[in-house]
């Protein structure tokens, strides 16, 4: 019995050593992937171990059977280990392919969800479509074929078929330069209606040729004139601007019209007042502050009394007219006072200072051709006023003192005082 137990014990450690070696290799190669196989095998080992423990004291034949079964299990374990190793080496390759597939699907989703417009998508699709196509675009070869025209070959102009046989081959252009009846010599005279038609065609051909010859020089002349006009545009524009400028109008007529309007307004105001001072001259009123007594006497006397006194003084003393520096040589004295009164008025209007820079007489508004003539008029009339200023006493004061009736009655004014 002791021997059998020893043998069984020696057999059991051998089987256990084999199982431990196989399990150690399995655990080192595939610990994570084949847990289920290990659990299954461990259960079998546990069952087998239980059986060996139960049959520890049984016959040796049964022990041999158990050893054989354990060896078979070990062989199956080694085969399973080899398969697991191959699976471990092949598994990363499969995982990489799976990862690549997943990345490609993610990229496709990203590109689809990106902000691409419809036009860009269409362009991409078109580009992908054209890349697949094989387009061999080449220009077509054109063959230059020289066709011989019938006119050049036969040197006869072909016209429509509505003409009869001899006339459809006639050269109307050649017959147009010759006389209209020259074609009758070449061709038998046909019917009257066809003759009129051919005559009309020849006339039209001739007119067309004449118009072309007439229009050719016109076209050349117009082309040359257009070229010259383009070259001479700046100079012609200057000439046009000079012509467009109107001549300068002298400014003197505007001054004259303004002075005339002012004098008319003053006359209207004086006529509306209705006072006896309306006939008193302006220069007599301007110097009223110098001598009050003389101005009062002038305001009281009327225009008729002044004229009579002036006429009486001129009849008695014809030298009074000589005292005027601007007066013309004295005319011969007459006995009638009617002839003397207008002369006194003319002298007073000429030599006294003018009321306005221009005469009061109405002036026509027509502009003169020579503006220098207008300038001469005020110069001649300014001389009288200048000469009167050169004297010690102005002339209008002398005349006012001498013509007043109160001073004449008192005898204060005399020719010696005036000198």
Swiss-Prot record:
Q: Where is the signal peptide?
A: none
Region described as Disordered: 1-23, 100-119, 234-298, 362-388
Q: Which Pfam families match?
A: FAM217 (PF15344)
Tell me the superkingdom of the source. Answer: Eukaryota
Where are the compositionally biased (Basic residues) regions?
Answer: 378-388
Q: Where is the composition biased (Polar residues)?
A: 7-23, 284-298
Which family is this sequence assigned to?
Belongs to the FAM217 family.
State what protein this is by name. Protein FAM217A
What organism is recorded for this protein?
Rattus norvegicus
Name of the gene: Fam217a
């Amino acid at each position: 019995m002791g021997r059998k137990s020893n043998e069984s014990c020696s057999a059991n450690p051998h089987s256990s050593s084999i199982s431990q070696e196989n399990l150690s290799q399995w655990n080192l190669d595939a610990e994570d992937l084949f847990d289920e196989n290990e659990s299954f095998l461990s259960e079998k080992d546990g069952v087998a171990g239980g059986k060996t423990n139960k049959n520890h004291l049984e016959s040796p034949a049964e022990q041999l059977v158990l050893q054989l079964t354990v060896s078979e299990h070990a062989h199956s374990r080694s085969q399973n280990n080899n398969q697991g190793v191959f699976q471990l080496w092949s598994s990363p390759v499969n995982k990489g392919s799976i990862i690549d597939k997943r990345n490609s699907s993610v990229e496709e989703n990203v590109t689809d969800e990106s902000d691409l417009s419809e036009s860009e998508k269409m362009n991409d699709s078109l580009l992908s479509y054209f890349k697949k196509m094989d387009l061999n675009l080449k220009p077509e070869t054109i063959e230059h074929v020289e066709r011989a025209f019938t006119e050049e070959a036969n040197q006869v102009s072909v016209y429509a078929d509505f003409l009869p046989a001899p006339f459809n081959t006639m050269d109307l252009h050649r017959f147009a330069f010759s006389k209209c009846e020259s074609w009758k010599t070449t061709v038998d005279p046909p019917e009257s209606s066809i003759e009129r038609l051919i005559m009309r065609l020849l006339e039209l051909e001739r007119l067309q040729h004449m118009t072309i010859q007439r229009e050719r020089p016109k076209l050349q002349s117009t082309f040359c004139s257009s070229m010259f006009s383009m070259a001479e545009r700046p100079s012609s524009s200057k000439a046009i601007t000079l012509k467009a400028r109107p001549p300068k109008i002298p400014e003197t007529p505007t001054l004259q019209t303004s002075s005339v309007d002012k004098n008319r307004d003053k006359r209207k105001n004086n006529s509306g007042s209705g006072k006896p001072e309306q006939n008193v001259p302006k220069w007599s009123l301007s110097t009223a502050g110098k001598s009050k007594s003389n101005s009062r006497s002038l305001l009281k006397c009327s225009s008729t009394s002044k004229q009579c006194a002036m006429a009486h003084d001129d009849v008695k003393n014809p030298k009074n007219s000589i005292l005027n520096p601007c007066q013309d040589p004295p005319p011969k004295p007459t006995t009638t006072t009617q002839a003397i009164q207008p002369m006194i008025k003319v002298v007073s209007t000429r030599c006294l200072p003018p009321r306005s820079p221009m005469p009061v007489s109405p002036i026509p508004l027509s502009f003169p051709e020579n503006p220098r003539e207008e300038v001469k008029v005020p110069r001649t009339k300014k001389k009288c006023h200048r000469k009167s200023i050169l004297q010690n006493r102005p002339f209008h004061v002398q005349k006012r003192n001498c013509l007043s009736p109160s001073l004449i009655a008192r005898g204060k004014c005399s020719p010696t005082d005036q000198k």
